[in-house]
Amino acid sequence: MPVDFLTSDQKQNYGCYAAEPNDVQLARYFHLDERDLAFINQRRGKHNRLGIALQLTTARFLGTFLTDLTQVLPGVQHFVAVQLNIHRPEVLSRYAERDTTLREHTALIKEYYGYHEFGDFPWSFRLKRLLYTRAWLSNERPGLMFDFATAWLLQNKVLLPGATTLVRLISEIRERANQRLWKKLAALPNKWQAAQVMELLVIPEGQRVSALEQLKKGPVTVSGPAFNEALERYIRLRSLEFSRLNFSGLPAIQLRNLARYAGMASVKYIARMPQQRKLAVLTAFVKAQEITALDDAVDVLDMLILDIIREAKKTGQKKRLRTLKDLDQAALLLARACALLLDDNTDVPDLRQVIFKCVPKNRLAESVSKVNELARPQNNNFHDEMVEQYGRVKRFLPAVLRDLHFRAAPAGEHVLAAIHYLAELNGSKKRILDDAPEHIITGPWKRLVYDAEGRIQRAGYSLCLLERLQDALRRRDIWLENSDRWGDPREKLLQGEEWQTQRIPVCRALGHPVDGRKGVQQLAIQLDETWKAVASRFEKNAEVHICNEGKYPSLTISCLEKQEEPPSLLRLNNRIKQLLPPVDLTELLLEIDAQTGFTHEFAHVSESGARAQDLHISLCAVLMAEACNIGLEPLIKHNIPALTRHRLSWVKQNYLRAETLVSANARLVDFQSTLELAGRWGGGEVASADGMRFVTPVKTINSGSNRKYFGSGRGITWYNFVSDQYSGFHGIVVPGTLRDSIFVLEGLLEQQTGLNPVEIMTDTAGSSDIIFGLFWLLGYQFSPRLADAGEAVFWRVNKSANYGVLDKLARGYADLSKAESQWDEMMRTAGSLKLGTIHASELIRSLLKSSRPSGLAQAIMEVGRVNKTLYLLNYIDDEDYRRRILTQLNRGEGRHAVARAICYGQRGEIRKRYREGQEDQLGALGLVTNAVVLWNTLYMEEALSWMRRNGEEIIDEDIARLSPLMHGHINMLGHYTFTLPEDILKGELRALNLNINNELSP
C-alpha cells in the first residue's frame, strides 16, 4: 500500500512556520503569563531567556522544538521579545552555541510543562486507538487523518515525531482496519453462499458477460417485460440469502464504498484479488445490490402503473374525440324532447304523443342509449380503458403478487388483504371471484368490478387493486422490507428509549418547549399580535388593497417596480468587467484548486491512500468533461501522463462520486464565505431553491415526462440550493418534475458546508401547509414567492378576535388543539429529521400523498397554516421583504444561466442512464459553477482594490449589488490546456486586464 500520501504543503509545513501567526494565534500560543515569565527569568542572559521562550511558544504552536531558532519568523520573535523587555531580538544569534544548552532547555520545558515524547506510554497507544477508530468507521482520506493526528498530538502536549513516522503509522493502521473489515465480511457467508458469489465472476456458457456484470445493470425502460427482468434480478440476489446475515457492527460507509467499488471495477480485476478481499468485496456488493435491485423493480412497477393510467387517458380521449359527433346528435335530439317538456303551452294529456310526433320514439330511445354509452360520469378517470389493458397487466401482475413481500400499516391492511387473495389465485383462470375483499372497491370502480349480477370480475378487480396499490405504496401505507426507497419511514423515526433520551435536547435545539400547551399558546399569541400589528398599519400600505368583488374578500398586491441601476453602479459594473482578465475554464479550475485545494477532497473509492502524480490535473480534466457534457475524448493528451485515456478513465471511475463531490464543493463554498465581497452580498443565512431542467434522450427509468419542459421526450430536474453569497451548497436530481415541496427541506438538512441557512425562498410550487409546518418545527423560515398570495386563505386561532380592516380576510380557523395532542409526535418527527435518521423527502412524500391525513399530518398542517399566515402577513406588510425574496430567486436563476453556459455539450442533454451517473455529472456541474463564481469573486475583489489604490470613486451601496455571475471573459470552448504559471500555482492572482481605455463612457 502506498505510504507517501502527503501533499507538498503538508510536507513543507509539518513542524515549521508556514506564515506569520495572526493576532488570535499570537494571543493564544505566544502570550507569556506570570508562570511562564517566572520560568523563563530563571535563565541567565537575554539570549537564553529569549531562546527558551521561543522554544516554549514554538512547542505550543507547532508541537515540536526547533534546533535552529532563526527559523522562527520575525513577527513571532518581536512579539515574544517585547514581553521579555528585550529590545534587540538579534541577541538570539548567541543562543544554544553549545548543544548541551539546547538539550537542557528542551528537557526543562518538557518536565515543567508536561510535554511527552511520541513513544511514551500511553500517548502513542491512545493516538493509535483513535486513528484506528476513525479508519474503521469512515473512509477518511489519510491526509485528513494526518492533520487530525497532528492536532491531537499538539493538544495533548505530545511532541511531533518525524513526518515519515506518522505517515507510516497511519498507513499501517488503515491497512489493519481494511484487513479486519475484509476478514469480518468474508466470514459472514457460509460455504454455499461463498461458492455462489464466486460463481458470479464466471461467464456462463453461451453468454458474453459474467453474472456479476449482468447484476450490475439496472432497468432502463418501463414495460411489463422490463419489470419482470428487474424482478428476476432482485430474486436472484435474494436467493443468495445475504439479507439474513448479520452485518451489525460493520461500518455502513465502508460497506457502501466496497459495494460501489465492486460495481465499477472490472470482473477481471476483482477475480485477481486475494481470496479474502475478493469475498469481502462480493459480499458487500450483493448486500447493497439486493436493496438497490428491489428499489429499482418497485420504481419500474410504479412507473408502469402510471404508464397504464396515462395510456388509458390517452385512449379515452381519442375515443371521446371520435364519438363527439354521435354524442352531439343524440344530445340535440334529447334537447328537443326536453324543450317540449318544459313548454308550458304543451297539453299534458297529449304530452307523449306531441313529443313522439316531433321526435320519433325509436330515435329517442337510440339517443338515450347513445348518451348512456358515450357520456362519462364526472368522477370517471378512464377506468374503462384501464380495464381494457388487463391483457398487458396479466404479463407482470402474477410476479408482483408472488415475488414482492408487502407489509402494511393499519391504513393499508385492506389493500394487503386483496393482494394476498389474488396471490392465492395465481395460476388460476377464474374470471369471477368469490369472497374477494371488497373494501378496496370504491366509487367509479364499482361499475367495472361488479357485473350485472353483482359478481366480482377479475379483470376490473385486478386493475382496481393495481391503482390502490400504487396509491398505498406512495403513501407508505404499503411498504417493503429490506427496501431503501420503498420501506417504512415510521421505522426510521427515533424510537423508545432513544427518543426519551433525545427528547429534551431536541426540543431545546429546535427552540420549542417540551410542553405542548405552552408551545401552541406561544404560537397563537404570535399570530394574534401579528394580525393586530399589520392591521394597524394597513391603511398606510399603498401597495396592497382589499378587493370585495368575489365571494370572499381578497388582496390586490401591486407588482414590484423594477429597481433601476444608478449610473454609478452601471459604471462600476462596466469597469470591473473590463478589468477581469480573460481565462480558459481549464486554467480557472487549476487556479481555484491552487487557492483552495479542493481536489484534495477526492479520495479513491477503495484505496483512499492511492494517489498519482499530477492527480489534480486529471481531476480537473474529468470535472470539466462531466460539467461541460463533452466526455473525456477532447481532453485526452497521450503525451501528458495526467491526461492519458487510461488515467482519466481511472480517475473518473475511482474518484468521482457523490461524497467526494460534496466534500470538494463544501471547500469552495466555505472559501467563498471568507471573502469580504461575498460578505457584502449576504451572511449565508438566506438561500433559494429552484429546479433546472435537462432533457434525457436515452432510455432511463430515472426521468419523467413534462411537455412544457421536455417536449415529447423525458427529462430530469436538478433541484439546487443557492446561498445569498451566490454559492450552490446542495443539489438533488429529481425524475421529471416532481413537486418541489418534496425536496425543499432536504437541501437545508443534508447540506455539508459551513453555511447555516435558516431562511429559504422558493417559487409557488415549493409551497404547502405541511412544508410551512415542518419548517417551523425545525426552526427555519420558509419564504416562497406565491403567485396567488392575494387569493390565499388567511387563518386565525381566535374566533372572537377583531382584526379591524383585515378581519374578514381571516376566514380560516386553525385548530391548534390537534397540534397540542400530537406535540410529542411532532417533536419526535422534527428530531428525527434534524438528526438524520430519516430523509426529509421520504417523510414529506408520505405525508403529502395521503388523501386521509393521519393525526400527525393534520397537526403539522394546522401549525403550518398558522405559520403560512404569519408569512403572508409579513409579505403584504413589508415591501422590502417581497423584494428580498425576488432578489434571492433572481440570484438562483442567474446561476442557472452560468451552469447552462458551462454545460454546452450534446445540446445540454444528460445522457446518463442511471441515477448515480446523473448525480455525479450534475454534482460536477455544480462544483465547476461554484469554481467560476469563486474565481469571479476573487478577481472582483482584486479589481475593487486596484480601483481604490488608483483613486477611483466607489460607492459602498453599489458593491452590494454587484454579481459574480458573469462568464463572457471565460473561454469554455475548444481550448483545453492544463498548465499554470508558477506564481499562480503558489496562490498568487494573475494580473488584471489593464490594457484597456481607462476612460469610462458617461
UniProtKB/Swiss-Prot annotation:
Entry keyword set: DNA recombination, DNA-binding, Plasmid, Transposable element, Transposition
GO molecular function terms listed in the Swiss-Prot or TrEMBL record: DNA binding; transposase activity
The free-text function statement in the UniProt record for this protein reads: Required for transposition of transposon Tn1000.
- Disulfide connectivity? none
According to UniProt, the name of this protein is Transposase for transposon gamma-delta
Q: Which Pfam families match?
A: DDE_Tnp_Tn3, DUF4158
Per the record, the GO terms for biological process are:
DNA transposition
Family, per the entry? Belongs to the transposase 7 family.
**Organism this protein belongs to:** Escherichia coli (strain K12)
The record's listing under InterPro entries reads: DUF4158 (IPR025296), Tn3-like_transpos (IPR047653), Tn3_Tnp_DDE_dom (IPR002513)
